[in-house]
Amino acid sequence: LRQPSSASNRTAASLDGQETPFQYEITDHGYGKDAVKVLHVSRKGPVHTIQEFEVGTHLKLYSKKDYYQGNNSDIVATDSQKNTVYLLAKKYGIESPEKFALLLGQHFLNKYSHVEEAHVHVETYPWQRVCQEETKASTTVGQGSCNFSSIDNRSLHNHAFIFTPTALHYCDVVIXRQDPKQTVITGIKGLRVLKTTQSSFVNFVNDEXRSLPDQYDRIFSTVVDCSWEYSDTDTVNFSRAWQQVKNIILRNFAGDPQVGVSSPSVQHTLYLSEKQVLDVIPQVSVISMTMPNKHYFNFDTKPFQQIVPGDNNEVFIPVDKPHGTIYAQLARKNLNSHL
């Protein structure tokens, strides 16, 4: 959970309660409860909807007397923060991680006047409905997965779900009492992808430190981490926007299902994804993305020509360390960001 970044300019308090300058001062502080797990079930007729979150709440108080004096009178206990997660989920339900985080953060500021800042972190557990193909008898040959992009609502189960950890949906919300703007940052973590062709890397710096040859056709694999900040939280559909960003990343990486898309570098694919997000979702002000290059090297069959004659373009050695790391942040001009 990211700590609140702003530092207080208040002077330190002495042990007798009087504020006095010390040689040292606390420049940042806060506390909270992490890893609060909650499952919410919406039961509207026979069709149930679930949301499972892992929530962290951190508060920053105006006072530092709990640190300087051991005076706990302003502390909203972390156990109380944990209970608040469950109570607000029961009272208001859960629509999206971002809206629930906004609800929690605003609640802490409204209820406790001595809270200066609230920061809420939410991670979503990726449940999807079981589809009809998965509930049939196990005589069908295949991987047993359902193509969620090609099924209609009639084939989705009303109340049974399957855990599908393709990528993590998370958000961070920071609400400061003195700042009218609510900071909402949403992210994708751990989106692992691979394509077997249409990736090249050529014409890079050629000097005495280079050993890598030009690669005109290589395996391209990465694990995408991406986060973006909203400039407008009133008009955006958070869940739809998250899915749009994910789809944009996959489309720029993979291209058309039949012919694919050429990638001259990880950098170019990353930039095209970020640019399209800003083009398509006007509420996003800035987006940051990291794409580590997960290497797959050809197994050298030259010493084994009597066993496997010819070239090898089928067997590869996965190498996770060391790996390249490519990242960039793309922003609309003249906008401030907390990313």
UniProtKB/Swiss-Prot annotation:
Its keywords, alphabetically, are: Oxidoreductase, Peroxisome, Purine metabolism
For the motif Microbody targeting signal, what are the positions?
337-339
**Localization per Swiss-Prot or TrEMBL:** Peroxisome
* Catalytic center residues: K33, T78, H295
Q: Where does the chain bind urate?
A: T78, D79, F201, R218, V266, Q267, N293
Catalytic activity, EC: 1.7.3.3
The Gene Ontology terms for molecular function here are: urate oxidase activity
NCBIfam families (alphabetical) = urate_oxi (TIGR03383)
Q: What is this protein called?
A: Uricase
State the encoding gene: Uro
